Amino acid sequence: VKVAYYSPLPPSRSGVADYSTLLLPALRERIDVVVAEEGKRAPDADVALYHVGNDPDAHGWIVDALMKRPGVVVLHEYVLHHLIAGITIGRGNGRGYLDAMERDLGVAGRLLGLGVLDNLLPLLWETQPERFPLSGVVLDQARGLIVHSHYVGERARSAGYEGRLWRIPHPVWPHGDVVPATDVSGDPLIGCFGYLNMNKRVPQVLEAFASLRRRLPGARLLLVGAAGERFDVERRLERLGLTEGVQRLDYVPEERMWSLMAACDVLVNLRYPTMGETSGSVIRALSLGKPLLVSDVGWFSELPDDVVLKIPVDELEVALLDRALEFAVEHGAALGAAARAYVEREHALPQVAEAYASALEVAAGGDAVDDAVLWRIAEAATEVGIDDAAGLARAAIDAGIVS
């Protein structure tokens, strides 16, 4: 089978770009893959594979290609409101945005969209994206769907997707022996990696860490990642008296990130609300055998209880986070061993690549069968004098004879 592969790739600062850099070599060992390039002619292939995330800069051109040729979609996160707004409103196509809102939410959605376009409502993709996912536009074009979690698969089905669906875990990086960074330290050193904003529960992490540091004065917190535009990290650190206990680093290259993570005693990766994403940072942390704290939501809830410490998002979040940090420090060896064993068993790159290859072979074969059936319908219609062959084809699709 020959696959046209649509994905952001480095130097794009995208988690999906990192994902594809990992997956592509293993996938090419199993099937013929042609990587599509933005602005270039679409490759000839038996089936197209589209990696879709929520960033319009990274994924807008991929959705453009999907609209021209349906194919297998890898849905890296369920909430796509920012993406859809970017490729509609961002291009001066307000009507496209209204259509997407109506597709998911009916007439009420269209009215909400009008409120946004008329500046009567705040930008929904900034204020409440989880309430208005707008993934239906993409799901309608999917001839097959690959997800990383039961959570996203169930939401896709609830949104009306009825086609083929495969759940394929996020692969783990074969990292070998990572040398821990020597320019960061703490007793213990707590690490928090990724974009710093309210959704990543950074305020709650800082509050819990301030409490932990009163008991463990040698503790230090390492924050790695760019901060949101309206998220003033430094001011929060001053208010909590943490200017001496926290080290801040901006975006770092892949190799540097690995070494920083390896230097940490405990890692924290919280988020709420979830957009249905799977976290590459979590997979990295588990593969390093690090004790890890996550929010008890979405895909993170599906991780085994003996592998991660799950923090409920409620009024007890900060208190539980504080105690969980201390527990992770004390039981780091056992938690880390369970984490490493889990990802090596469930997220191994060869088995992930094999699952992709199998899914794409099924999708390509299914498409070929569907095309043959539709061609025979058209041929038979002509033989008996029926002019509306296209109408018969649509009826066959509606009846589930072909997809």
Please report, for each region that a protein language model flagged, where it lies by residue.
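C-terminal amphipathic helix plus adjacent low-complexity
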Residues: 340-345, 349-403
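Conserved donor-binding/catalytic core segment of Leloir-type glycosyltransferases
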Residues: 183-200, 206-209, 222
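Nucleotide-activated donor-binding/catalytic signature segment of Leloir-type glycosyltransferases, i.e.
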Residues: 187, 233-255
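Acidic donor-binding loop of glycosyltransferase active sites
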Residues: 143, 261-276, 290-291
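Glycosyltransferase donor-sugar binding loop
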Residues: 193, 220-233
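Carbohydrate-associated surface elements
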Residues: 151, 171
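Membrane-proximal helix-turn-helix segments that form the acceptor-binding/catalytic region
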Residues: 98-144
